[in-house]
Swiss-Prot record:
Protein name: Zinc finger and BTB domain-containing protein 7C
Keywords noted in UniProt: Metal-binding, Repeat, Tumor suppressor, Zinc, Zinc-finger
GO terms assigned for molecular function: DNA-binding transcription factor activity, RNA polymerase II-specific; RNA polymerase II cis-regulatory region sequence-specific DNA binding; zinc ion binding
Domain BTB as annotated: residue spans: 34-101
GO cellular component: nucleus
Compositionally biased tracts (Acidic residues): 133-173
Cross-referenced Gene3D superfamilies: Classic Zinc Finger, Potassium Channel Kv1.1, Chain A
Amino acid sequence: MANDIDELIGIPFPNHSSEVLCSLNEQRHDGLLCDVLLVVQEQEYRTHRSVLAACSKYFKKLFTAGTLASQPYVYEIDFVQPEALAAILEFAYTSTLTITAGNVKHILNAARMLEIQCIVNVCLEIMEPGGDGGEEDDKEDDDDDEDDDDEEDEEEEEEEEEDDDDDTEDFADQENLPDPQDISCHQSPSKTDHLTEKAYSDTPRDFPDSFQAGSPGHLGVIRDFSIESLLRENLYPKANIPDRRPSLSPFAPDFFPHLWPGDFGAFAQLPEQPMDSGPLDLVIKNRKIKEEEKEELPPPPPPPFPNDFFKDMFPDLPGGPLGPIKAENDYGAYLNFLSATHLGGLFPPWPLVEERKLKPKASQQCPICHKVIMGAGKLPRHMRTHTGEKPYMCTICEVRFTRQDKLKIHMRKHTGERPYLCIHCNAKFVHNYDLKNHMRIHTGVRPYQCEFCYKSFTRSDHLHRHIKRQSCRMARPRRGRKPAAWRAASLLFGPGGPAPDKAAFVMPPALGEVGGHLGGAAVCLPGPSPAKHFLAAPKGALSLQELERQFEETQMKLFGRAQLEAERNAGGLLAFALAENVAAARPYFPLPDPWAAGLAGLPGLAGLNHVASMSEANN
């Protein structure tokens, strides 16, 4: 009985929900199928009842209070600000809340009145005591400057070839931005939190306000509403922290390779410079370590850790043990966030080649399509292809992008900015790879070569188009006239004839087409053997009477065609004179000179001289 029932197969469509939401947003902007009109301070907002009821409990109660026929079309709301309602509507259709330090209070009040709890929680976390807006604005400006530099570097590499190192820097820079949705909430510290906070309170004053208990940067539970928070559970492997580490350090054990020397005296001789907000300060404020119970597993043999380096760098750091650090899911993301670029404010710079070697090369698997993503910061970017999230929007044409650097490049179309200038001809370009392709015109470099015909190209897409056509793999005839050696050989021998070094003549093409009507006379020409003379066979011979008859037929056809053309035109003496002139023209007879010289000395072809005299008389 169970075998008769077909097994149900569930086929998921991850992008369906986001596509439906995007379609509803387009309908809202175009005013299509909108069944409710919200009026706030003489500003009208057309929207859909179902979307509002799904996001707000207030609208759900309002729209389900009576029958649909009794509900009005226009609702006037006087308890919210227009900017706050516009931001909430944008959140309802795009799942992205755009707020500023000035309108966060208005959005909080509107979310409370409309009963949207998730927006209320986010606004309360942003307005936490100690998180003043001035400090956030300063950090936002600094981070934007860093983003501009890093995005310029990334743009140069991603269009020509995808570089995992640039993707890691881009993801880390996006994490540095003080997004209001990424600011963690304040929770009551646990017993282990007091231990770590006490340890951080004894650290040197080089890192002020970063490790003090009760500050916004104290260690607590990570809570954010970005896409990364959806991926943390059962995604990052738990990091096994060695028990031998005597002090708390945010660095992974494998951060320093085995090939590094153990003596770091050269770094310790550099003078210490005070930092207003170092990279570690920013990391610990925005990314906080949540402590859990440590799994009782035998730790692997630890690699050598340069403790002497930290002793020289932090001479005032107390050497007492601070307690074991518990492993957790978020610790892997915390370690992947660190890179040599972000630690540049703390440690002296080293060569770029070694810096690239130190960057983490983590591999993560997509939980939806199970594709292995190489690079620490590429998985959240890959997840946006499934969720359809596009958090960056153009303020002019309202086109959305998944990445901030793509939005910056798109804005150049509106501003007309062309930052890349050619030093030879002063040509300007929007993209750096366009400048590289243009520079090859001046340098003559063709780096892309076909492996079949060895033809070189200046651009990779030209090579791909050439290979796709497969024009270099197939044999094709030459265009235009054949070389002189080929024409001479074709006059002497046929396709299956002997080699060109043997003396023989073959019938020209004009004579070969009308051949096969040999009369009584035969023409014999010198050749390799008597059996291969072309007039020895009946098919290749031609009589003199047939040649004269064909010449007369050609003259009559040309004369009749000229008369028809003269009658078709607007007649007159001029048209008749032109027709007579055309009729009197001698037709071309394709008989080359070598044949005339070769046939003149033969007694059986004396009639050909009569044909030549007739053509001369016509001239």
